[in-house]
């Protein structure tokens, strides 16, 4: 089966029990991309508990639903069963506006359609959208359109091509969060 990326209303419907997220994950690769509010509904925990220990929430979601999760926030975290945790290193708090999650999900879907694995698609999507936000340099007025318009520039950027982690899209030289 083809991979799925789930966000927003799909996650809310799963939280309401309208479909079995765990059973669906047995039939195909899934990447779920909740923010803290969506994760709180999925896990039946308060949003403050999710925010207080994002890593524990991420681990619990992966354990309970048996697929890859990208927990959006500062920093964004990605985890899949049996894999290490990936930490998003690009972007700023300016990405926390309406529509940015849709941009991230769209990039994830495009990368999944090209054959990337769910964890790799999530990590590369975080990098592409975060770096594009940094290049747009719009500050608090940043819009999803700004981010999408800068992705082609990110794709042609050239760096050293070396990563101590063996992942060419992970870097730790990001600007400090605002």
Regions found by a protein language model. Give the residues of each.
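Gly/Ser/Thr-rich active-site loops/lids in small-molecule metabolic enzymes
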Residues: 51-64, 87-112, 118
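Short, surface-exposed, charge-dense and proline/glycine-enriched linear segments
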Residues: 99-109, 148-157, 166-174
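Conserved post-catalytic alpha-helical subdomain immediately downstream of the catalytic base
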Residues: 106-152
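Glycine-rich phosphate/dinucleotide-binding loop and adjoining beta-alpha-beta core of small-molecule
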Residues: 1-90, 156-178
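Flexible, active-site-adjacent loop/turn segments at secondary-structure boundaries
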Residues: 9-12, 37, 93-95, 140, ...
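Hydrophobic, well-ordered secondary-structure elements that form the walls
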Residues: 7, 102, 121
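Solvent-exposed, flexible loop/coil residues
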Residues: 15-17, 46, 99, 146, ...
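A short glycine-/small-residue-rich loop at the edge of a beta-strand within enzyme catalytic domains
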Residues: 30, 48-52, 95-98, 138, ...
């Amino acid at each position: 089966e083809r991979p799925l990326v789930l966000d927003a209303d799909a996650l809310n419907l799963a939280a309401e029990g309208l479909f079995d997220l765990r059973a669906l994950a047995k039939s195909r690769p899934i990447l779920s991309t909740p923010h803290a509010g969506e994760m709180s509904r999925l896990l039946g925990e308060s949003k403050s508990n999710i925010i207080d220990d994002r890593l524990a929430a991420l681990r619990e979601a992966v354990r309970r639903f048996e697929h890859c999760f990208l927990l959006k926030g500062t920093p964004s975290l990605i985890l899949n069963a049996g894999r290490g945790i990936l930490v998003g290193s690009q972007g700023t708090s300016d990405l926390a506006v309406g529509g940015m999650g849709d941009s991230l999900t769209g990039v994830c879907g495009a990368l999944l359609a090209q054959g990337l694995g769910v964890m790799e698609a999530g990590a590369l999507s975080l990098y592409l959208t975060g770096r594009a936000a940094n290049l747009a340099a719009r500050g608090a007025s940043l819009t999803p359109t700004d981010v999408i318009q800068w992705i082609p520039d990110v794709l042609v950027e050239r760096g050293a091509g070396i990563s101590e982690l063996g992942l060419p899209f992970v870097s730790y030289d990001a600007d400090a969060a605002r």
